[in-house]
Amino acid sequence: MTIPIVIEQSGRGERAFDIYSRLLRERIVFLGQQVDSNLANLIVAQLLFLDAEDPEKDIYLYINSPGGSVTAGMGIFDTMKHIRPDVCTICTGLAASMGAFLLSAGAKGKRMSLPHSRIMIHQPLGGAQGQATDIEIQAREILYHKRRLNDYLAEHTGQPIERIAEDTERDFFMSPDEAKDYGLIDQVIDRHAAGSRPVAMVGQ
């Protein structure tokens, strides 16, 4: 994938930034692919940088992801909770599986979705192979992650743990309005005023 370059004029001449570096200057982090350890390390590094730069200003995490590794995603989640700024989460396109979990983990009142996005929750996927003892170990690990994710989803949404467990047994897709009613997000957003801060500031 070709990454766009942004050219800026300043008193010192022209400066070139890749689009993600330019967005980072506005405290915008973009999670736009499947979550794996490499992506998680990049997201964590950006969150830590923005925390060090200004611990008082919000960070905007835009999510368009089909999900991915639970352990990698939990690294992002733990960092979101570890740093001092509020992390505003915004779904644009798709937030599925770990993507939906991270969307729900944003600061309360600052979890959002654009109007035509889709949001999906389900249980962790597993493909255990090998000897019986190895399969048993992997199965226990999957059940551990399932319980942890369900507990956090119940905390994020306010839903009873029994409903979370039932709804995540299969792929459970929601529109933004349905996700708002469910408690995964706080608002569905569209336009923002010209010249304002990024759309994630709406409602603050």
Curated annotation (Swiss-Prot):
Record's keyword annotation contains Cytoplasm: yes
UniProt superkingdom: Bacteria
Family affiliation: Belongs to the peptidase S14 family.
Subcellular location field: Cytoplasm
Organism, as annotated: Nostoc sp. (strain PCC 7120 / SAG 25.82 / UTEX 2576)
Pfam families assigned to the protein according to its UniProt record, in alphabetical order: CLP_protease
Active site: 97, 122
PROSITE patterns cross-referenced by the UniProt entry: CLP_PROTEASE_HIS
Predominant cellular place of this UniProt entry's protein: cytoplasm
Keyword Membrane found: no
GO biological process, one term: protein quality control for misfolded or incompletely synthesized proteins
Catalyzed chemical reaction(s): Hydrolysis of proteins to small peptides in the presence of ATP and magnesium. alpha-casein is the usual test substrate. In the absence of ATP, only oligopeptides shorter than five residues are hydrolyzed (such as succinyl-Leu-Tyr-|-NHMec, and Leu-Tyr-Leu-|-Tyr-Trp, in which cleavage of the -Tyr-|-Leu- and -Tyr-|-Trp bonds also occurs)
Entry keywords, A to Z: Cytoplasm, Hydrolase, Protease, Serine protease
A cellular-component GO term for this protein: endopeptidase Clp complex
Enzyme class: hydrolase
Subunit description: Fourteen ClpP subunits assemble into 2 heptameric rings which stack back to back to give a disk-like structure with a central cavity, resembling the structure of eukaryotic proteasomes.
Enzyme Commission number, as recorded: 3.4.21.92
Free-text function comment from the UniProt entry: Cleaves peptides in various proteins in a process that requires ATP hydrolysis. Has a chymotrypsin-like activity. Plays a major role in the degradation of misfolded proteins.
UniProt-recorded Gene Ontology molecular function terms: ATP-dependent peptidase activity; ATPase binding; serine-type endopeptidase activity
Protein name in the entry: ATP-dependent Clp protease proteolytic subunit 1
